[in-house]
Swiss-Prot record:
It comes from the Bacteria. GO terms for biological process: rRNA base methylation. Specifically methylates the N4 position of cytidine in position 1402 (C1402) of 16S rRNA. InterPro entries: RsmH, SAM-dep_MeTrfase_MraW_recog, SAM-dependent_MTases_sf. One of its GO terms (cellular component) is cytoplasm. It is found in: Cytoplasm. This is Ribosomal RNA small subunit methyltransferase H. Coiled coil: none annotated. One of its GO terms (molecular function) is rRNA (cytosine-N4-)-methyltransferase activity. S-adenosyl-L-methionine binds at A33, G34, H35, D53, F79, D100, Q107.
Length: 310
């Protein structure tokens, strides 16, 4: 699989995070290496770039792209291992960290990865092929109550219970093994009137299953907790999100770093020990321009938030 990936908010992210050409920067979501390539173009010979990706194909692509560049360190690992990996590489602290939380276009477009509801393929959705839990396992073996909660919580799918009822009935007859089979089940479950409105009827269900299979939100929370420890004072973290669940986690985490007092108003003196660890570089998230959205419709829902360690 070749990575032909259109990077979102490229200049805005790199301009906001990379400020010291001799610094060490971490791309936690290497993907097609679009952000990493631009970061490298901004670094001097003393600068360093660390790229994380749990997909071995992304690592292979980056090895080919950056072959022979001594500034580049590639880690075939989920970014949940950020702090441990940087310690083992003896690269702490770092001057910047960036995350692009969108599924890379090759993963969406290559049918065999099983992420897309637009192409029929094996029902998979694993970012890391070594992950024992696939979407096929989850759909065929997950309890109905758990599946309904996943679709509602991670996909905000209002037809979650009805979709799961149809899934349970279908899997009684035979295992659901392909994306096409699952799409057909979802279409049968959602009333015709509702299917004609809004996005593709399978979009929310596929998003929810992908998040659950890869524990995306849990991994993000744990990684952000590490980021603030990994950054040098003045270092920045930039995070691009693509849906409200991710953005809420980033917003709440950044706000928790501001050190605002949480004591009741009746307390004359702060007792909670609040201490500011970071500041927001921009009060509101940065959004793609109309021109970028026109050129790359997948950018439409992107939001960029940047924080700076004090």
């Amino acid at each position: 699989m070749e990575f032909h990936h259109v990077t979102v908010l490229l200049k805005e992210t790199v301009d906001g995070v990379v400020r010291d050409p001799s610094g060490t920067y971490v791309d936690c979501t290497l993907g097609g290496a679009g952000h990493s390539g631009y970061v490298l173009s901004r670094l001097s010979e003393k600068g360093k770039l660390v790229g994380f990706d749990q997909d071995p194909l992304a690592i292979k692509n980056a090895q080919d792209k950056f072959a022979g560049d001594p500034r580049v360190f590639l880690v075939n690992r989920n970014f949940e291992g950020l702090e441990e990996s940087l310690q083992s590489l003896e690269l702490l602290p770092v001057q910047g960290v960036l995350f692009d939380l969108g599924v890379s276009s090759p993963q969406l477009d290559e049918a065999e990865r099983g992420f897309s509801y637009m192409q029929d393929a094996e029902l998979d959705m694993r970012m890391n092929p070594q992950n024992p839990l696939s979407a096929k396992t989850l759909v065929n073996e997950g309890k109905a109550e758990m599946l309904a909660e996943i679709l509602w919580k991670y996909g905000e799918e209002k037809w979650s219970k009805r979709i799961v009822e149809f899934i349970v009935e279908a899997r009684k007859q035979k295992s659901i093994t392909t994306t096409g089979e699952l799409v057909d089940i979802i279409k049968r479950a959602i009333p015709a009137g509702a299917r004609r409105e809004g996005p593709h009827p399978a979009k929310r269900t596929f998003q929810a299953l992908r998040i659950a299979v890869n524990d995306e939100l849990g991994v993000l929370e744990r990684a952000l907790d590490q980021v603030i420890r990994c950054l040098a004072p003045g270092g920045r973290v930039g995070v691009i999100t693509f849906h409200s669940l991710e953005d809420r986690i980033v917003k709440e985490t950044f706000n928790s770093w501001l050190g605002r007092c949480t004591c009741p108003p009746v307390f004359p003196v702060c007792q909670c020990g609040a201490r500011a660890m970071a500041r927001l570089v921009h009060r509101k998230p940065i959004l793609p321009s109309p021109q970028e959205i026109e050129a790359n419709p997948r950018a439409r829902s992107a939001k960029l938030r940047i924080a700076e360690k004090l």
